[in-house]
A protein has these predicted regions:
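Short, solvent-exposed loop/linker segments at the N-terminal edge
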Residues: 499-508
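Short proline/glycine- and polar residue-rich coil/turn motifs
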Residues: 116-122, 229-232, 401-404, 416-417
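Conserved small/polar residues in nucleotide/adenosyl-binding loops
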Residues: 510-517
């Protein structure tokens, strides 16, 4: 995992940093296309298939088509579709349309026609039957008129085969994809001067015929060590004359299609930066054992095939996970090991994949339970996570946290032994409605917040606020202290004080009453 940069990208998801994430498996993608691309920032066609009625797609036309193509070349017999109206002006609702299917994008079969349809309220979902017995890769909703406005909008489209939704919102393809076919480049920052002798390229479907492998020590002066006009795609292993460089660039000058796509770029040699873990856990003055730094690791959940019971086993192998910063967001962990460009510098947030970080992640750590906790009631405390979390200790699920700013305290006495190793695993859930990327400009700051507010309590401003850009991942992670504490079997918890004043005389004396809850374990 090293920071990588691109000359352009086709969207906010397929950015250069994905060429060093260690994932060489390029999945096909569902493709969403529309007749008109004049939608405002934050109201893109992707909103139609995000599963949230709180977002929408808008075009400045009274008509226009919307097309969905299934991922990985899949085809389905869609016999029902559902449309959801948007949040405001009913005059923008579709009124007349056709619904068609195709396997090549050229020849379309009409499956349904509707006229004079009216939504009775905002964010209302209406279901329609399609007379269909054939499987198609693509489906198109062609809106021929709306209810009277010069703009058309919808919140959601869903496609069903025998009452099973075929919109797969979990597909993620780890690749960089350029915005065009003209000369394009991606380069990797190795973090320090290294000796390089080989580069391995893992191409997507859209590979370069003509390209160069270039080296640099300063990002300004580049020298080419390899050049070809006969690129073959797939996996290309290029042996090089050993050279020193801090930056390695793939410079593409000719390809087979309208884009270039690259799943992974591996650089071989000697040298390089080795991330180091933070300070080890320590005992606080109040007797709490703080698990700051130490052995924390983090990994995207899609790359972990086991469940929490197995991940929280102390012998679980997490060698391919990255070192985590705790407390901190997932994005902070990747930044601190040099795996992504610094999003606080210039417009470099556009170099970081939103889809990669807007996902579920696993955290885990191992530690030795303090001997001083022997014969005590032992507690695991998490002072703050975002967005939601499932918590596991030594192969047992101990509880969950249902939102940011909510503290979690779990009795782990049955699962740990003083003086022995223990493991904590925390599954962090992404936001249900993370919203779309907004790009600020001199003409518009974009929206303040947005649909992310439906997930409150969460970090609402992370979707974008005034001229603050959208944070990749929406600040999910373990954001506050994690520590172990010990008590006796009876504790006084949740204390609070009530002040009784003898009004109107508020000077002579005050009566204080203390209240608490007795926790008897």
């Amino acid at each position: 995992n090293r920071a990588a940069y691109h000359s352009s990208c086709s969207n906010f998801d397929y950015t250069a940093h994905l060429i060093t994430d260690g994932n060489t498996d390029v999945q096909g993608d569902s493709k969403i296309t529309v007749q008109y691309s004049d939608f405002p920032s934050g109201e893109s066609p992707e909103n139609l298939f995000d599963g949230s009625p709180n977002s929408k797609y808008l075009t400045f036309h009274s008509e226009g088509w919307i097309q969905y193509e299934f991922a990985n070349g899949a085809s389905y017999i869609i016999d029902r579709y559902v449309l959801t109206s948007a949040n405001d002006d009913e005059k923008r609702d579709p009124k007349n349309w056709t619904f068609s299917g195709s396997n090549d994008g050229k020849n379309w079969t009409l499956l349904d026609t509707r006229s004079d349809i009216r939504f009775n309220k905002r964010k209302e979902s209406l279901s329609f039957t399609a007379k269909n017995t054939n499987a198609y890769r693509m489906y198109r909703l062609d809106i021929t008129d709306n209810r009277g406005d010069n703009r058309t909008q919808l919140s959601e489209i869903d496609l069903f085969e025998k009452n099973v939704s075929r919109i797969d919102r979990s597909v993620f393809s780890s690749k960089w994809e350029s915005a065009g076919k003209e000369d394009q480049w991606v380069y990797i920052d190795l973090g320090t001067i290294c000796r390089i002798n080989k580069v391995k390229l893992f191409w997507g479907e859209e590979f370069a015929r003509s390209y160069q492998i270039q080296f640099s020590t300063d990002k300004r002066n580049w020298r080419s060590l390899y050049s070809t006009n006969e690129g073959k795609g797939g996996i290309e292993e290029i042996k090089l004359t050993t050279a020193t460089a801090k930056y390695v660039r793939l410079y593409m000058t000719g390809g087979i299609s309208e884009h270039y796509s690259l799943a992974e770029m591996e650089v071989y040699g000697t040298g390089g930066v080795i991330p180091k873990q933070m300070a080890v856990p320590y005992m606080g003055k109040e007797g709490a054992y703080y698990l700051t730094g130490g052995n924390w690791k983090v990994q995207r959940a899609s790359l972990v095939k086991l469940d929490g019971l197995e991940v929280s086993d102390p012998v679980f192998d997490d060698r391919d996970w990255i070192i985590a910063t705790v407390p901190g967001t997932v994005l902070t962990s990747y930044l601190n090991i040099g795996a992504i460009p610094d999003p606080n510098f210039g417009d470099q947030q556009l170099q970081i994949s939103d889809a990669f970080f807007t996902a579920d992640f696993w955290y885990r750590t191992t530690f030795i339970v303090p001997n001083k906790y022997k014969e005590k009631r032992i507690w695991l405390n998490l002072n703050g996570i975002n967005w939601k979390a499932d918590v596991f200790v030594n192969g047992h699920r101990v509880g969950d946290i249902k939102g940011a700013f909510i503290r979690g305290k779990f009795d782990i006495t049955p699962y740990v032994v003083s003086g022995e190793k223990a493991c904590i695993a925390v599954y962090i859930h992404k936001n249900d409605t993370p919203g779309q990327i907004t790009v600020q400009s001199l003409n518009s700051a974009g929206k303040n917040g947005g649909v992310l507010g439906a997930d409150n309590p969460t970090i609402h401003a992370s979707v974008g606020w005034d001229w603050l850009p959208t944070m990749r991942g929406r600040n999910i992670g373990i954001q506050d202290d994690v520590f172990i504490s010990a008590t006796n079997d009876v504790s006084l918890i949740d204390p609070f004080i009530i002040s009784d004043l003898p009004l109107p005389d508020s000077v002579s004396y005050t009566h204080l009453r203390a209240h608490e809850t007795v926790l008897d374990l």
